[in-house]
From Swiss-Prot:
The gene is wdr45. One of its GO terms (biological process) is protein localization to phagophore assembly site. The keyword Acetylation does not apply. This is WD repeat domain phosphoinositide-interacting protein 4. The keyword Repeat applies. WD repeats lie at residues 2-40, 185-225, 230-269. Signal peptide: none annotated. Coiled coil: none annotated. A motif (L/FRRG motif) lies at residues 226-229. GO terms for cellular component: cytosol; phagophore assembly site; phagophore assembly site membrane. The lineage of its organism: Eukaryota, Metazoa, Chordata, Craniata, Vertebrata.
Length: 355
């Protein structure tokens, strides 16, 4: 994610009610509805930060050093407990021999991704290494972790090009080399991954970025193929709505796409779908479902997207947070109408400002 206005990285928390910014000047945390700053760590405390991950809305943060003036190394994950008194609020440290590329948290585990390895530790009390998985080259540290208490599913790239691995951390035995289930999702390298909050669905896109495929975690079968576009694109983010009725994605094309999952008839189809029998290559294109709705953000600014709180049964909202400091909220209807409801510059909001 390209850096602008001092923002090195952006992440939503597990229920998408907050987002956090890893910055050249430290860390800032924002509540989404209403939009307001929830807290911050300044540069004197933590230096410049490359990555930050929240644990729900609690006092624990996972930090990885980065940027131009880091206080901490990029081979370490530091756990910051903001509830502790005094200046020393670093309570845990996980150090490796290679750079940490991503961190995921749930209430009882922490997952840390390196270029060719995924580590899983118990968390936060007396952390113990539970699992270690080898992966093919994973330069973006792709992985996702289900936050559900019922399902402890972890997904990450498999050994085969375009494959993803699915591990049930509940059933696997700590310390064992439990073989993950493999889903052959794409023909080219994976570019983006997401798992829904219930742990029942996985979405993936390749680095080509034209298609998003949806899989059932129980049967590991493909359920639907969603078409973002025809031109290659780098996907920054895929997210499910809270009840998994919808999915959104953002890319370097500057468009946030919204797809229907529960009622896929709401998605648009290619006009060629009405033509009749076509060749196999065109057939694949015709069979794809196009987004129900979409909106644009500055194309030169990387962004993450997520679903907001439902305002009514027939109106849903999507939030886009960009590294240029802008915040966008759009509402959409099942008919595909999409309108901007809010815009702000979150980096200009202070502690006492409320949106």
């Amino acid at each position: 994610m390209s850096q602008q206005r001092g923002v090195n990285g952006l992440r939503f928390n597990q229920d998408q009610s907050c987002f956090c910014c890893a910055m050249e000047t430290g860390v800032r945390i924002f509540n989404i509805e209403p939009l307001m700053e929830k807290g911050h760590l300044d540069q004197e405390q933590v230096g410049s930060v490359g990555q930050v991950e929240m644990l729900h809305r609690c006092n624990l943060l996972a930090l990885v050093g980065g940027g131009s003036n880091p206080k901490f190394s990029d081979i370490s994950v530091l756990i910051w407990d903001d509830s502790r008194d005094g200046k020393d609020k670093l309570v845990l440290e996980f150090t490796f021999t290679k750079p940490v590329l991503s961190v995921r948290l749930r209430s009882d585990k922490i997952v840390i991704a390196l270029k060719n390895r995924i580590y899983v530790y118990s968390f936060p009390d007396n952390p113990t290494k539970l699992f270690e998985f080898d992966t093919r080259d994973n330069p973006k540290g792709l992985c996702d972790l289900c936050p559900s208490l019922e399902k402890q599913l972890l997904i990450f790239p498999g050994h085969k090009c375009g494959s993803l691995q699915l591990v049930d951390l509940c059933n696997a035995k700590p310390g064992s080399s439990s073989a993950p289930f493999t889903i052959n999702a794409h023909q080219s390298e994976l570019g983006c991954l997401a798992i829904n909050q219930q742990g029942t669905l996985v979405a993936s896109a390749s680095r080509k970025g034209t298609l998003i495929r949806l899989f059932d975690t129980q049967t590991r079968e493909q359920l639907v193929e969603l078409r973002r576009g025809t031109d290659p694109a780098t996907l920054y983010c895929i997210n499910f709505s809270h009840d998994s009725s919808f999915l959104c994605s953002s890319s370097d094309k500057g468009t946030v796409h919204i797809f229907a999952l529960k009622d896929t008839k709401l998605n648009r189809r290619s006009a060629l779908a009405r033509v009749g029998k076509v060749g196999p290559m065109i057939g694949q294109y015709v069979d794809s479902q196009w987004s129900l709705a979409s909106f644009t953000v500055p194309a030169e600014s990387a962004c993450i997207c997520a679903f907001g709180k439902n305002t009514s049964k027939n109106v849903n909202s999507v939030i886009a947070v960009c590294v240029d400091g802008t915040f966008h909220k759009y509402v959409f209807t099942p008919e595909g109408n999409c309108n901007r409801e809010a815009f702000d510059v979150y980096l200009d909001i202070c502690d006492d400002d409320i949106f």
